[in-house]
């Protein structure tokens, strides 16, 4: 039987993932409205990939005979400014990564090998999202917000992530 603290952690990770999905989709729509087409497309993909990750978490919880807490969300942090969007989203993803690491530690200590494997795979997916978001903030720091947003008005200005 899996410890209750691990179940709570899994539901907390799910809550953050569900929040991220909604935040990504809201930001995608704002970006599209502002003509930032390439990053709007990337954000839509982040939301879709986040849905796949949430599905994996739900399957894990169901396999453990637990009811996933899909009604729980954190407060969405949204803004019209692309740099603030990226900052909010990066903070949320980094918080999720921290939660996954804590849960992984408990799983390893409890010798929950199947959970450790599943969470490690999820962690890799989330770290890719973090890499993308942090790289966009780094580009803004390097070239400035004006040049960055001008480049985003082209549909394929940034590389596509999986």
Identify the role of each PLM range.
Residues 1-162:
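Iron-associated oxidoreductase/ferritin-like identity signal
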